[in-house]
Amino acid sequence: VERQDRLRTVVLPAQSANAGQPLQSVMNDGIVVTALVREGVRRLNPEADTVMAGEDILVLFGSADDLDRAERALLQ
């Protein structure tokens, strides 16, 4: 079975438990953060040590299953 990678956009909730955590906490399970948008400023291929903030927009790349897991974790 061929893996079908795709992109997904996730908006981190304002009061997210993930705010203050580095992107590397998301960049496992086959997920790559391809962009981060904060206050209208887009950063392509952000560094793994970039700290997430509430209302960040993350563009994730990975398989559908990996993206589902990452989105559930981010929206907690």
Regions found by a protein language model. Name each.
Residues 1-3, 7:
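Anionic-ligand-binding alpha/beta catalytic cores of soluble enzymes and soluble regulatory domains
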Residues 9-76:
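Cytosolic Rossmann-like ligand/nucleotide-binding regulatory domains
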